[in-house]
Amino acid sequence: MSNLLKIVEQDYLAVQKALPEFKAGDTINVHVKIKEGAKERIQQYQGLVIQKRNSGNGASFTVRKISAGIAVERIFPTMSPFIDKIEVLRAGAVRRARLFYLRDKTGKNARIKEKKKPVVEAAK
């Protein structure tokens, strides 16, 4: 049975959507398809990635945002057909894979420094 699952997973991973590389600590904008009756629209969910689970087709990531002073966390399956696209807005400089300690912090204490990018000198 496990061999059959591996074969099916390989087929799905071969046709996997081209998603950008991101990790815990990055600020991302997820475009989610929302169905309301017969209509379908796209809603943007912007927040901080606090964890990323990589396990084949069961991969998922958790995004945390503050909305009207209330923290909201949402778990997105990576292979979900409801995800239209993902944009990486900022790369955070963190040393952990799971940022659950941010749940206890508020305001300025919950900020994450931005990762420094290497300076490219102009060609003369």
From Swiss-Prot:
GO annotations of cellular component type: cytosolic large ribosomal subunit
Give the Pfam families listed for this entry: Ribosomal_L19
Q: Name one GO molecular function term.
A: structural constituent of ribosome
Keyword check for Transferase, yes or no. Answer: no
Q: Which domain of life is it from?
A: Bacteria
Keywords, in A-Z order: Ribonucleoprotein, Ribosomal protein
Biological process terms from the Gene Ontology for this record are: translation
Q: Which PROSITE patterns match?
A: RIBOSOMAL_L19
Instruction: Decide whether keyword Ribosomal protein is in the record.
Output: yes
Write out the coiled-coil annotation as residue ranges: none
Q: Report the sequence similarity comment from the record.
A: Belongs to the bacterial ribosomal protein bL19 family.
- Enumerate the HAMAP family for this protein: Ribosomal_bL19
The UniProt function text for this chain reads: This protein is located at the 30S-50S ribosomal subunit interface and may play a role in the structure and function of the aminoacyl-tRNA binding site.
Q: Give the protein's recorded name.
A: Large ribosomal subunit protein bL19
Give the classification, highest ranks. Bacteria, Pseudomonadati, Bacteroidota, Cytophagia, Cytophagales
Encoding gene (name): rplS
